[in-house]
């Protein structure tokens, strides 16, 4: 990837979501962005204004003279823009008709409709950002919680880029020493270089392992944590869902089997995005519809990252309760011992023979008792080892994680090769492979096809 600014045609797109709103933004980027906007703008001559200024005027159809909208136009000149090209943003009134009319006028004056993610792609191709920072733009847009937003901002600020760049530089330095050894064997520095190669491989591998240790948390922040609320009928599953959502999504009655399907909702719990699944009560039934719901509930347990197993402490432990405890034994789970506001009938001693006391949170959902403790346990369960995600460098997407694992595998081969006494020029091949894989993360050695595919996932106007 070249950091020099490359000339492209001028592109245009609507950067705000479609529909009614106070303001819409139509964005242009490219060598003729200012001249194109000038053709449809009635106000100041945009070709004469200073960079990073905003101007009042009207958009007018240059052929018919029809007044389209009253607007504010921002002019930002290269290279101090997101794309490192001239950028113009037309702030018009929100609404589908006026916004589309303005876009069509710009296209009629020679601008091209931008492809999905093309503004961000140009920022990457012009050296403004690397691939990790480009991916963080979409992560920021899609962030479901404050913590997810912090991680995205952290990457956008270049923290992951800086770390990967440092690791590549460390590998490059030792590869240069290996080249000297190969080119000038008479200096007989093989032993010293081999020792340096081993130490560097171990150092870089430790840093990569530390990054990979954040992968599960990063994936949760990016995609959400699939959380199944399970239990036999009428123990308070739907009440728990409604309380966590702060609204009534599930039917709550005293009738067993009221929830006959699987309900899914997203909720933010202390910065952890939960994809809550309220399942039908798991029990033996002859009702055909209920049977389908029970089967879907069993599937939800299998697919869930976290189980909230709700038990009713106002009733004795049942065979169905024990079956659910056994079915979820190998999953991350929290035992929600509900209905603490009612007289106790459940034998706690018997329960503790089946579950750890650390798994139990006592609740009385109608009074909110224990709900703060439940939220805290969920957050601690998944982010207990990461105190401050604002400063912690994390990886969150499958592409980055996969490349880090491939780099780690190459470093394993380096270390194994050195211990096996392999020639240094053969070991060098695996060290170079690790360097290449790290470069793919930032885009420095990424193939064009990958770059095109990555940016195609972005939304229009970004």
Curated annotation (Swiss-Prot):
<feature type="binding site">
    <location>
        <position position="255"/>
    </location>
    <ligand>
        <name>K(+)</name>
    </ligand>
</feature>
<dbReference type="InterPro" id="IPR027266">
    <property type="entry name" value="TrmE/GcvT_dom1"/>
</dbReference>
<dbReference type="Pfam" id="PF10396">
    <property type="entry name" value="TrmE_N"/>
</dbReference>
<comment type="function">
    <text>Exhibits a very high intrinsic GTPase hydrolysis rate. Involved in the addition of a carboxymethylaminomethyl (cmnm) group at the wobble position (U34) of certain tRNAs, forming tRNA-cmnm(5)s(2)U34.</text>
</comment>
<dbReference type="InterPro" id="IPR027417">
    <property type="entry name" value="P-loop_NTPase"/>
</dbReference>
<feature type="binding site">
    <location>
        <position position="462"/>
    </location>
    <ligand>
        <name>(6S)-5-formyl-5,6,7,8-tetrahydrofolate</name>
    </ligand>
</feature>
<feature type="binding site">
    <location>
        <position position="89"/>
    </location>
    <ligand>
        <name>(6S)-5-formyl-5,6,7,8-tetrahydrofolate</name>
    </ligand>
</feature>
<keyword id="KW-0547">Nucleotide-binding</keyword>
<dbReference type="Pfam" id="PF12631">
    <property type="entry name" value="MnmE_helical"/>
</dbReference>
<dbReference type="InterPro" id="IPR004520">
    <property type="entry name" value="GTPase_MnmE"/>
</dbReference>
<dbReference type="GO" id="GO:0005525">
    <property type="term" value="F:GTP binding"/>
</dbReference>
<feature type="binding site">
    <location>
        <position position="234"/>
    </location>
    <ligand>
        <name>K(+)</name>
    </ligand>
</feature>
<feature type="binding site">
    <location>
        <position position="253"/>
    </location>
    <ligand>
        <name>K(+)</name>
    </ligand>
</feature>
<keyword id="KW-0819">tRNA processing</keyword>
<dbReference type="InterPro" id="IPR006073">
    <property type="entry name" value="GTP-bd"/>
</dbReference>
<feature type="domain" description="TrmE-type G">
    <location>
        <begin position="224"/>
        <end position="383"/>
    </location>
</feature>
<dbReference type="GO" id="GO:0046872">
    <property type="term" value="F:metal ion binding"/>
</dbReference>
<keyword id="KW-0630">Potassium</keyword>
<feature type="binding site">
    <location>
        <position position="258"/>
    </location>
    <ligand>
        <name>K(+)</name>
    </ligand>
</feature>
<dbReference type="InterPro" id="IPR027368">
    <property type="entry name" value="MnmE_dom2"/>
</dbReference>
<keyword id="KW-0479">Metal-binding</keyword>
<dbReference type="InterPro" id="IPR031168">
    <property type="entry name" value="G_TrmE"/>
</dbReference>
<dbReference type="GO" id="GO:0030488">
    <property type="term" value="P:tRNA methylation"/>
</dbReference>
<feature type="binding site">
    <location>
        <position position="128"/>
    </location>
    <ligand>
        <name>(6S)-5-formyl-5,6,7,8-tetrahydrofolate</name>
    </ligand>
</feature>
<keyword id="KW-0342">GTP-binding</keyword>
<dbReference type="Pfam" id="PF01926">
    <property type="entry name" value="MMR_HSR1"/>
</dbReference>
<feature type="binding site">
    <location>
        <begin position="278"/>
        <end position="281"/>
    </location>
    <ligand>
        <name>GTP</name>
    </ligand>
</feature>
<comment type="similarity">
    <text>Belongs to the TRAFAC class TrmE-Era-EngA-EngB-Septin-like GTPase superfamily. TrmE GTPase family.</text>
</comment>
<dbReference type="InterPro" id="IPR005225">
    <property type="entry name" value="Small_GTP-bd"/>
</dbReference>
<keyword id="KW-0460">Magnesium</keyword>
<protein>
    <recommendedName>
        <fullName>tRNA modification GTPase MnmE</fullName>
        <ecNumber>3.6.-.-</ecNumber>
    </recommendedName>
</protein>
<dbReference type="GO" id="GO:0002098">
    <property type="term" value="P:tRNA wobble uridine modification"/>
</dbReference>
<dbReference type="GO" id="GO:0003924">
    <property type="term" value="F:GTPase activity"/>
</dbReference>
<feature type="binding site">
    <location>
        <begin position="234"/>
        <end position="239"/>
    </location>
    <ligand>
        <name>GTP</name>
    </ligand>
</feature>
<feature type="binding site">
    <location>
        <begin position="253"/>
        <end position="259"/>
    </location>
    <ligand>
        <name>GTP</name>
    </ligand>
</feature>
<feature type="binding site">
    <location>
        <position position="238"/>
    </location>
    <ligand>
        <name>Mg(2+)</name>
    </ligand>
</feature>
<comment type="subunit">
    <text>Homodimer. Heterotetramer of two MnmE and two MnmG subunits.</text>
</comment>
<keyword id="KW-0963">Cytoplasm</keyword>
<dbReference type="GO" id="GO:0005829">
    <property type="term" value="C:cytosol"/>
</dbReference>
<dbReference type="InterPro" id="IPR025867">
    <property type="entry name" value="MnmE_helical"/>
</dbReference>
<keyword id="KW-0378">Hydrolase</keyword>
<feature type="binding site">
    <location>
        <position position="27"/>
    </location>
    <ligand>
        <name>(6S)-5-formyl-5,6,7,8-tetrahydrofolate</name>
    </ligand>
</feature>
